[in-house]
């Protein structure tokens, strides 16, 4: 149990908008990208990938980033539910904040798993692919939706 009182729910979770673009989504992405407390490196990776996105697509990188997140965000996911000794994978709708967090985690995880290029290039390529509804992150979303569809029979166990 915390010794200090927790902040109200409205004030928890969402960071201040980032300094360059004024976007809360980008600030959340930078916070997730943060590695070993080195936020300045995470910011340089993010802004560097935005420069690459602008160079390759000729579009506003923030709109490409937001479109990529929209294309990756899952609408359904399966959650384990134990009923009478058996565990069922129950499909459930995903709240907006969780779906955005999942999308951010998937983008970063996939970019980190690739090898051979600097992180800003891998991240930029993954964001561009996701904005075109291509790439591994979109495939991950489709797999999540397929899993929910396959377990639709257990939807009545929803709580």
UniProtKB/Swiss-Prot annotation:
Domain of life from the UniProt record: Bacteria
Lyase recorded as keyword: no
GO cellular component terms given for this protein: small ribosomal subunit
GO molecular-function term, one example from the UniProt record: rRNA binding
Gene Ontology terms describing biological process: translation
SUPFAM superfamilies according to UniProt: Ribosomal protein S7 (SSF47973)
Gene3D superfamilies noted in UniProt: Ribosomal protein S7 domain (1.10.455.10)
The keyword Ribosomal protein is annotated on this UniProt entry: yes
Protein keywords: Ribonucleoprotein, Ribosomal protein, RNA-binding, rRNA-binding, tRNA-binding
Coiled coil (residue ranges): none
Family: Belongs to the universal ribosomal protein uS7 family.
Subunit structure: Part of the 30S ribosomal subunit. Contacts proteins S9 and S11.
Function: One of the primary rRNA binding proteins, it binds directly to 16S rRNA where it nucleates assembly of the head domain of the 30S subunit. Is located at the subunit interface close to the decoding center, probably blocks exit of the E-site tRNA.
Protein name: Small ribosomal subunit protein uS7
Species for this entry: Endomicrobium trichonymphae
Gene that encodes the chain: rpsG
């Amino acid at each position: 149990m915390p010794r200090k009182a927790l902040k109200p729910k409205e004030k928890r979770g969402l960071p201040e908008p980032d300094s360059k673009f004024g976007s809360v989504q980008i600030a959340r992405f930078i916070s997730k990208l943060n590695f070993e407390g080195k936020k300045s490196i995470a910011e340089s990776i993010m802004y560097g990938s935005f420069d690459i996105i602008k160079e390759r697509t000729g579009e506003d990188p923030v709109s490409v980033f937001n479109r990529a997140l929209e294309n990756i965000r899952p609408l359904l996911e399966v959650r384990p539910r134990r009923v009478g000794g058996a565990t069922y994978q129950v499909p459930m709708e995903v709240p907006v904040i969780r779906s955005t967090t999942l999308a951010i985690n998937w983008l970063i995880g996939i970019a980190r798993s690739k090898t051979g290029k600097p992180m800003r290039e891998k991240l930029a390529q993954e964001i561009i692919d996701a904005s075109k509804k291509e790439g591994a992150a979109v495939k991950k979303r489709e797999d999540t939706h397929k899993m929910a569809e396959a377990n639709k029979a257990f939807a009545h166990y929803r709580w």
